[in-house]
Amino acid sequence: MKQVYIIKKNNPKLLLFFAGWAADETPFKQYCPQGMDYMICYDYRTLDFDTSILEQYRQVNVVAWSMGVWAAPIAVPKEKLLLIAFNGTITPIGDTDGIPEKTFRDTLSGLTPASLQKFMRRMCKDSNAYKAFLAITPRRDFNEIKEELELIEKKYTQMRGITIDENGNYIYSNDDEMDAYVNDKYQYIDYDYAFIGVNDRIFPLENMKLNFDYMFDDDKLIVADCAHYDEPMFRFLLQDMWSMPIDDFLSHLRELDT
């Protein structure tokens, strides 16, 4: 995992952003959370995370997006954290609470530079949003991105006790192994808030709702009118909300919730 400082001014607080698959810092480096250092994490070919950088901060606030919603609770310790999820699940592959298995397998097996561009187009709400995204699109090597998706699948299936046959089909473990996985899943660090988009075309809305059902009441799950990649929502989550008085923050949550 890469950890890149965007702002490092020895502030007492850190905003730690876990980006999605195929991302880097390019689309997110324009944001400036008030009174905080700001670090972006990406490239989940490994989930190794240098926790020593957290020791200098009084408070660490975590925003996780897309595949980062799965990676963040694995990487970070439980202390001093406020965790916010956006358009992702802690079960990255799953027919009921993640990206449907066939969709994930088809994306991986058919991945080309052209299909990657189609994926990025699907992340965006409309053609104008996609055009704006192209100006700040990640600058990573395609082969590295493909390897990242392969290793995400490998890591997740190993964690869950799933084997993959020669045709790419998932073979699930026996009941004892599944029970062990479920128990481990529920020991994840719980998110404090989750924002999910009605126009998300990567993670199905109902799957995200199911994923967060066990964590908290409905007032902590915000269903917003946004796409998978949504620049106004990122501006709120990575910048504006951190300078809001609490009453304004809660009022804005009510406005966002559809």
Residue map of PLM features:
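Conserved alpha/beta-hydrolase "acid-adjacent" motif
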Residues: 201-207
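Catalytic histidine-centered segment of alpha/beta-hydrolase-like enzymes
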Residues: 223-241
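Acidic beta-to-alpha connecting loop that harbors the catalytic carboxylate
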Residues: 198-201, 225-227
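Flexible "cap/lid" loop of the alpha/beta hydrolase fold
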Residues: 80-110, 138
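Conserved HGGG/HGGXW glycine-rich cap/lid loop of the alpha/beta-hydrolase fold
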Residues: 2-48
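Conserved alpha/beta-hydrolase catalytic His-Asp/Glu region
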Residues: 114-156
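Short beta-strand/loop motif that positions the catalytic acidic residue
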Residues: 194-196
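Gly/Ala-rich beta-loop-alpha elbow adjacent to hydrolase catalytic centers
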Residues: 63-68, 72
